[in-house]
């Protein structure tokens, strides 16, 4: 990615969106400028780095301070128009020179600690991912030369509070944020980074020994599992709209059972073979309901009423009034059939189950008895 392509906006739904840079780039720049300030013994207010994607960033330095053989500097995180929990916070680096010839990297205040296997970092280490570790160490080595050593501490005073708005605790990263970024650049509306964060949670679950997973669209699904199924939510992973991707990731990781749990408004799309459930990709909820109601012998009057509905909830009221609630078991079986069709070339496909529930947390339907599914999940 050239500097020109970094400055060029990302167009999304007709809007020009600005790119940003990662916490990894912030930490790298802060460490580099702190090392330079120790060597030169004067404050520096701007620093440039080359990101892993080849982009040169020129960043403003905040809170520079020198005290003997130690310096501190901060870079303010700018996610561009892809605002996340870390946007606008300061990422600090403290660099202390020594004669060891080695560079040691640690995480201080506000940087999370790894407490579970599965994310590629040792247990008990700071949540500074591999690529940022490499770029930080390389930038400091470039600044101090081959003979000197340095202790580098990355810290973020707001980190612990900001981390509460992230997935970190679910990934076993406690006490702060993660220093992340494989390219160093934040691309607005990047589905790939979002999908990767969801997949990472699957990897954590598998590394902990789980072989069965419950995929839900969001928090409502997790609450249903806890309150109505009596199953430990440790097995629950959010799939958002990325149904097909998360199923494929679960297969890749070797899960033997996948249970899809959600409201018909989301899961009904899978019955039509739609594995990305965001409305900008496809809708077809009413069409799917009408088709399957017709297969079950529903009268034309009901089909017309459902076809004219704007929401699944409205359609469900008509379905209940006409006594066709058994469609939800039918749809759950159809969902499982569609999943197995998607996985037809998989050598050892997992068991697939589907459970549909209402907004008031009542079971609407499933491909087989929910008690049976719950019992297997508790094994």
Swiss-Prot record:
Pfam families the record matches: CbiD (PF01888)
HAMAP family the UniProt entry points to: CbiD (MF_00787)
GO molecular function, one term: cobalt-precorrin-5B C1-methyltransferase activity
Keywords, alphabetical: Cobalamin biosynthesis, Methyltransferase, S-adenosyl-L-methionine, Transferase
SUPFAM superfamilies: CbiD-like
EC code(s) of this entry: 2.1.1.195
Any one Gene Ontology BP term: methylation
Encoding gene (name): cbiD
NCBIfam families named among the record's database cross-references: cbiD
Reactions the enzyme catalyzes: Co-precorrin-5B + S-adenosyl-L-methionine = Co-precorrin-6A + S-adenosyl-L-homocysteine
Name this protein carries in UniProt: Cobalt-precorrin-5B C(1)-methyltransferase
Database matches in InterPro entries: CbiD, CbiD_sf
Superkingdom of this protein's organism: Bacteria
Family, per entry: Belongs to the CbiD family.
Pathway(s) served: Cofactor biosynthesis; adenosylcobalamin biosynthesis; cob(II)yrinate a,c-diamide from sirohydrochlorin (anaerobic route): step 6/10
């Amino acid at each position: 990615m050239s500097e020109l392509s970094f400055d060029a906006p990302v167009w999304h739904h007709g809007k020009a969106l600005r790119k940003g840079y990662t916490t990894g780039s912030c930490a790298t720049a802060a460490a580099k400028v702190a090392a330079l300030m120790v060597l030169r013994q004067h404050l520096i207010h701007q620093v440039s780095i080359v990101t892993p994607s080849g982009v040169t960033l020129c960043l403003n330095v905040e809170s520079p301070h020198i005290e003997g053989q130690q310096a501190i500097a901060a870079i303010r995180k700018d996610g561009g128009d892809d605002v996340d929990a870390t946007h606008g916070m300061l990422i600090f680096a403290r660099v202390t020179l020594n004669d060891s010839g080695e560079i040691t990297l640690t995480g201080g205040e506000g940087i999370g600690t790894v407490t579970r296997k599965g994310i590629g970092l040792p247990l008990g280490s700071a949540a500074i991912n591999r690529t940022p570790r490499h770029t930080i160490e390389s930038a400091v080595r470039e600044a101090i030369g081959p003979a000197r050593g340095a202790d580098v501490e990355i810290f973020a005073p707001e980190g612990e509070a900001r981390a509460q708005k992230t997935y970190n605790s679910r990934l076993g990263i406690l006490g702060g944020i993660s220093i992340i970024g494989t390219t160093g650049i934040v691309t607005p509306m990047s589905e790939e980074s979002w999908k990767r964060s969801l997949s990472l949670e699957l990897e954590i679950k598998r590394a902990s020994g789980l072989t069965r997973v419950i995929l839900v669209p969001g928090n409502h699904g997790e609450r249903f599992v806890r309150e109505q199924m009596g199953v430990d939510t440790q097995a629950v992973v959010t799939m958002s709209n990325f149904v097909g991707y998360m199923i494929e990731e679960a297969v890749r990781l070797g899960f033997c059972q996948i249970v899809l749990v959600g409201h018909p408004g989301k899961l009904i799309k899978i019955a039509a073979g739609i594995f990305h459930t965001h409305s900008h990709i496809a809708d077809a909820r009413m069409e799917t309901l009408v088709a399957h109601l017709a297969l079950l012998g529903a009268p034309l009057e009901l089909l017309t009423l459902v076809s004219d509905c704007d929401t699944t909830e409205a359609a469900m009221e008509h379905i209940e009034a006409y006594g066709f609630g058994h469609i939800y078991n039918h749809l759950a079986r159809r969902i499982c059939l569609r999943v197995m069709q998607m996985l037809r070339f998989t050598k050892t496909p997992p068991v697939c189950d589907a459970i549909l529930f209402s907004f008031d947390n009542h079971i609407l339907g499933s491909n087989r008895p929910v008690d049976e599914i719950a019992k297997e999940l508790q094994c």
